């Protein structure tokens, strides 16, 4: 329709030796807007890069986030919070490629999905054979606040080195009914109690 909007964006970040970069993305579009966001990050020795993605709106959002560790003593951090409802769809695809030894990466994505919302998390960590002493962490936690909401999560590890520390995991659940009851028993209305629990989870 005439009100539909489609955006295809590309961001490239080149972190030189010992550089420190913090990059924040806030996605809060109209329900008629679709976005494909492509972010590519190339890191050199000793660089530290953090990307924080907040996805709150839009009809369809696809985030492609790719880190390439082209050096040693590199630290890469990806954090994301998704809060959507209605028929919104947010799709996170992450890749961290550990190419050199003695590097770290941290991924922590959280999602809260309401009525008819759909979420996807597809995260991959690749550790090359030469990338010994790698420390890589990946976690995706989700709450479905409606029985019509869905989440598809797929954390992945491809490890070709033998001296590494790598972990990944995911959780899918609902709001804690006992915690909700406790807050209501202290005089907090149900709507506000639910909001407090979701805030605590996302925080």
Language-model regions, residue ranges each:
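Conserved beta-strand/loop scaffold segments within soluble protein domains that form the structured core
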Residues: 1-181, 185-188, 202
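Short, surface-exposed loop/turn segments at secondary-structure boundaries that line and modulate
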Residues: 197-203
């Amino acid at each position: 329709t005439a009100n539909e909007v489609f955006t295809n964006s590309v961001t490239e970040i080149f972190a030189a030796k010992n550089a420190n970069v913090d990059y924040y993305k806030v996605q809060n579009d109209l329900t008629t807007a679709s976005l494909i966001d492509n972010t590519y990050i190339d890191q050199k020795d000793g660089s530290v890069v953090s990307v924080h993605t907040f996805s709150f709106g839009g009809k369809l959002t696809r985030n492609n986030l790719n880190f390439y560790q082209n050096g040693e003593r590199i630290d890469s951090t990806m954090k994301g919070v998704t809060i959507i409802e209605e028929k919104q769809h947010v799709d996170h695809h992450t890749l961290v490629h550990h190419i050199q030894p003695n590097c770290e990466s941290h991924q922590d994505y959280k999602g809260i999905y309401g009525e008819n919302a759909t979420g996807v998390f597809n995260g991959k960590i690749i550790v090359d054979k030469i990338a010994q002493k790698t420390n890589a962490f990946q976690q995706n936690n989700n709450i479905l606040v409606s029985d019509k909401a869905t989440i598809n999560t797929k954390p992945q590890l491809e490890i070709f080195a033998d001296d590494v520390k790598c972990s990944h995991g995911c959780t899918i659940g609902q709001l804690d009914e006992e915690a909700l009851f406790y807050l209501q028993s202290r005089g907090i209305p149900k709507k506000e109690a639910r909001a407090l629990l979701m805030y605590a989870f996302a925080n």
